[in-house]
């Protein structure tokens, strides 16, 4: 600053423009504007010399000096780094702003003659910027301290839950993850092959490349208060919210109508966020009615952040203390490995261990070591306790170690009592019917090869309830009981994932031995009497062709008067013999007509077919071919409902067809089947054993 003033000595540029707000001068004949000194003596103007020494340039405090010593002392130079070489991004904006405002106000107080004479506009605008900065949630100093004391803004107390060493470690991990994201984005295998990038696969692959796994926390939107849901997401009523975390660091939150959709939306936002300049901060977030500290990833340079409420309970993030190396010990580490509870919701041992660790909120880790004979040894650690080890290749050793670890954990599992969890599939029984129905009146309704579907259809057909009750046996084995109307039909023992299918199969076999079975053959083969598109369109053509020209027709009378007696037209009768058939014209058909619109079937033709079927006494169903479009099938559904018929579509895609039939009671269908043996595509099979 002294150098600039020294350079500007002796230079006079005349009067400088004023940056203060000035009122316009009143015109002649008008009264002057009222001022703050009305009724008082206005202050006298101080006499001053017109010519005096004035700085040629306005003093700008961020001009750097040229010497190395001054550059080192410059508080606005490069930011200092810690011992590990990583920048403390979290402290950079606040420290920089405090030094900046402090020097600015010191210039105002120390060099007031230059500020007042030249209208130092930068310092005049400074309080506005200060308010803008501290409106984002940081405590703002009072105006008195800005003008008089010039004290910097008070810093918040350091976090006791997350020490600086932990934040620096998480910052290093996020920088490593960001580099991995950019590396995968430049990989053509990740972006080519499809128009849309699979962000979930990319984020999972990048996080696993950093030797860890992502964490997804789901919550139904019904359980979240409406005030905590973003305004643009309030249209969702039955959706889900998904929070993505990694190493206890919050990344993003996604909202969608399903769990997979919310996860995909959250991972997409996370990948886009990791492509920017980001940092790890400790902020206060809300979880239901509790406010606690949390580690979050936010963009550098953004002063205000609006984070959605946390979906993970804050008690899962509590630091209980520090170990010998100074690292924090979290609540999950306080659990002993013997309290581990196995949840059998996977097929292999690795999946069971990972899912169980997530359920118990414990940490499981696999460590590899190459042996002298060029084989790999994999050891499984649960809560830093070695459970088992396996040998082989890097892949087979992990599976072998997981199998051995699972056997060790199964031995330590306590003997649980029968843990029951039921799934009830109830039929459409009438309300208020509390009478228990007899199993002897049950009719097995077989509409699928899956025994679970057969049992559910049977329960709905007979208006009964079916339940599947699980009982935990030893190890990974479970017992499943099938209960129909409070009566046990069958049971099976096996793995939880397949024991339900086995128990349902045994129940169907047991019921077929004593109860009649109605088999629906509609899905088992092609239907013979299928109504095609041409058959529907041919009805209009046949009716138009059958129309007879009457004697009082004007055209007929004109031809008779000209000598036509019948037969072909023309002198020798070589013309047409039959009248021109009526051609239907929809709306304004003509040049440029879409061919597909011409091939559409008429609604009155469909209604005529269904009306004739409803008035007849036929017991077979109407089956429309797969040539019909979605709109045409929609019309058939509406017309069938109009005449009190039931309609249902079967198949997928181009193989989808529609069946229209009568609403039958179970008793009427059984009576017809007993008399005729087969009604339409229904077939009756009597019990195999008495």
From Swiss-Prot:
GO cellular component labels: nucleolus
Motif position, Nuclear localization signal? 25-45
Where Phosphoserine occurs, residue numbers? 618
| InterPro entries hit by this protein | G_patch_dom (IPR000467), R3H_dom (IPR001374), R3H_dom_sf (IPR036867), R3H_NRF (IPR034071)
Q: Annotated DNA-binding ranges?
A: 296-388
Which stretches does the entry tag as region Active repression domain?
1-296
Where on this protein does the Glycyl lysine isopeptide (Lys-Gly) (interchain with G-Cter in SUMO2) crosslink form? 68, 500, 666, 674
Q: Which residues form the R3H domain?
A: 600-664
Keywords in alphabetical order, please.
DNA-binding, Isopeptide bond, Nucleus, Phosphoprotein, Repressor, Transcription, Transcription regulation, Ubl conjugation
Domain named G-patch is located at: 551-596
Q: Note the Pfam families from the entry.
A: G-patch, R3H
Extent of Polar residues compositional bias: 139-150, 414-425
| Major subcellular location class | nucleus
Q: GO MF terms on file?
A: ATPase activator activity; DNA binding
Region (Disordered), start-end ranges: 27-49, 65-85, 133-160, 414-436
Q: Subcellular localization, per the record? A: Nucleus, Nucleolus
Q: Main role?
A: Enhances the ATPase activity of DHX15 by acting like a brace that tethers mobile sections of DHX15 together, stabilizing a functional conformation with high RNA affinity of DHX15. Involved in the constitutive silencing of the interferon beta promoter, independently of the virus-induced signals, and in the inhibition of the basal and cytokine-induced iNOS promoter activity. Also involved in the regulation of IL-8 transcription.
Complexes and interactors: Interacts with NF-kappa-B. Interacts with XRN2. Interacts (via G-patch domain) with DHX15; promoting the RNA helicase activity of DHX15.
Which PANTHER family does this one have?
NF-KAPPA-B-REPRESSING FACTOR, NF-KAPPA-B-REPRESSING FACTOR-RELATED
What protein name applies here? Answer: NF-kappa-B-repressing factor
Q: Which gene encodes it?
A: Nkrf
């Amino acid at each position: 600053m002294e150098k600039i003033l020294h350079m500007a000595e002796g230079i006079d540029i005349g009067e400088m423009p004023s940056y203060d707000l000035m009122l316009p001068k009143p015109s002649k004949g008008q009264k002057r504007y009222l001022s703050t000194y009305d009724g008082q003596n206005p202050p006298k103007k101080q006499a001053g010399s017109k010519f005096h020494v004035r700085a040629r340039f306005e003093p700008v405090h961020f001009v750097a000096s040229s010497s190395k010593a001054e550059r080192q002392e410059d508080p606005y130079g490069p930011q200092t780094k810690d011992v590990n070489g990583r920048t403390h991004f979290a402290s950079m904006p606040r420290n920089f702003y405090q030094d900046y405002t402090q020097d600015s106000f010191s210039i105002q107080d120390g060099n007031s003659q230059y500020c007042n004479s030249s209208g130092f506009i930068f310092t005049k605008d400074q309080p506005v910027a200060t308010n803008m900065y501290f409106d984002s949630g940081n405590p703002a100093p009072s105006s008195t301290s800005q003008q008089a004391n010039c004290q910097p803004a008070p810093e918040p107390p350091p976090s006791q839950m997350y020490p600086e060493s932990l934040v620096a470690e998480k910052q290093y991990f996020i920088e490593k993850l960001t580099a991995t994201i950019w590396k995968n984005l430049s990989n053509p295998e990740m972006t080519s092959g499809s128009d849309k990038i699979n962000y979930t696969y990319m984020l999972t692959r990048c996080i696993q490349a950093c030797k860890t796994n992502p964490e997804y926390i789901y919550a139904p939107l019904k359980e979240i208060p409406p005030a905590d849901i973003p305004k643009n997401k309030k249209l969702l009523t039955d959706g889900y919210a998904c929070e993505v975390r990694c190493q206890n660091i919050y990344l993003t939150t996604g909202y969608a109508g399903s769990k997979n959709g919310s996860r995909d939306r959250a991972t997409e936002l996370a990948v886009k966020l990791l492509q920017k300049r980001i940092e790890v901060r400790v902020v206060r977030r809300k979880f239901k009615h509790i406010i606690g500290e949390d580690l979050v990833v936010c963009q550098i340079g953004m002063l205000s952040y609006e984070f959605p409420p946390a979906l993970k309970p804050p008690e899962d993030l509590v630091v209980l203390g520090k170990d010998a190396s100074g690292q924090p010990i979290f609540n999950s580490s306080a659990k002993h490995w013997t309290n581990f509870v196995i949840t059998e919701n996977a097929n292999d041992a690795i999946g069971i261990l990972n899912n169980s660790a997530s359920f118990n909120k414990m940490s499981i880790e696999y460590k590899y070591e190459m042996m002298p004979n060029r084989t790999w040894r994999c050891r499984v650690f649960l809560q830093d306790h070695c459970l088992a080890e396996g040998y082989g290749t890097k892949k087979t050793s992990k599976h072998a170690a997981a199998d051995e670890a699972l056997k060790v954990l199964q031995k330590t599992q306590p003997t649980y009592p029968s843990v029951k969890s039921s799934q009830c599939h109830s039929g459409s029984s009438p309300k208020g019917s509390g009478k228990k129905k007899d199993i002897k009146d049950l009719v097995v309704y077989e509409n699928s090869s899956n025994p679970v579907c057969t049992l559910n259809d049977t329960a709905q057909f007979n208006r009964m309830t079916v339940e599947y009750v699980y009982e935990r046996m030893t190890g990974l084995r479970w017992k499943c009981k099938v209960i129909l109307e409070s009566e046990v039909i069958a049971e099976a023992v096996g793995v939880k994932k397949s024991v339900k299918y086995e128990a349902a199969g045994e129940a169907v076999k047991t019921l077929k031995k004593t109860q009649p079975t109605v088999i629906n053959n509609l899905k088992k083969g092609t239907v013979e009497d299928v109504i095609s598109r041409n058959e529907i369109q041919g009805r209009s053509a046949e009716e138009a062709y059958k129309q007879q020209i009457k004697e009082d027709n004007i055209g007929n009378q004109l031809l008779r008067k000209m000598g036509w007696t019948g037969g072909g037209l023309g002198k020798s009768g070589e013309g047409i013999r039959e009248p021109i058939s009526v051609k239907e014209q929809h709306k304004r058909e003509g040049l440029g007509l879409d061919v597909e619109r011409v091939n559409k079937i008429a609604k009155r033709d469909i209604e005529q077919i269904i009306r004739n079927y409803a008035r007849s006494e036929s017991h077979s169903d109407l089956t429309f071919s797969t040539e019909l479009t979605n709109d045409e099938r929609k019309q058939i559904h509406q017309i069938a409902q109009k005449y009190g018929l039931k309609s249902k579509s079967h198949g997928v895609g181009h193989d989808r067809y529609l069946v229209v039939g009568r609403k039958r009671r179970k008793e009427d269908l059984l009576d017809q089947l007993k008399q005729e043996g087969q009604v339409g595509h229904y077939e009756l099979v009597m019990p195999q054993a008495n």
